Amino acid sequence: MDCRVVVEAAVPVYDVQSTDEAVRIAISKTGEMLNPDLNYVEIEMGSRSCPHCGTDTEPAFVAADESLVALELSMTVFNVERDEHAARIARKEIGQRLANIPLAVLEVDTVTDDDTQESTGGDTETA
């Protein structure tokens, strides 16, 4: 079984003035830490919402020129027996490269053969 695992990372960024700047720097910083070993990990802005009213908020919180940015890192883990196994592998692989950055598994989805072929651009038709 193959699984797509999405992990949330809380990336600290220093000397920033705006949330947009913080997000750009956090994505760049995370990409540098993951590459070239884990260039197959997709990096996206995290989605945050207010715990009280549920409204969407910025993925970065800026105070005193420092920021904490929520990023979502996703990767496909191949040949696992259970979802928990896929989550552990993803946390270990990503966590080794992102030292001192908190990680939390957001979701684990089973990947079907159709999903794999669509994401890799495979063609199922035969001539």
Curated annotation (Swiss-Prot):
Signal peptide: none annotated. Pfam families: DUF555. InterPro entries: UPF0212 (IPR007564). NCBIfam families: PRK03922.1 (NF003035). Belongs to the UPF0212 family. This is UPF0212 protein VNG_1264C. It comes from Halobacterium salinarum (strain ATCC 700922 / JCM 11081 / NRC-1). The lineage of its organism: Archaea, Methanobacteriati, Methanobacteriota, Stenosarchaea group, Halobacteria.
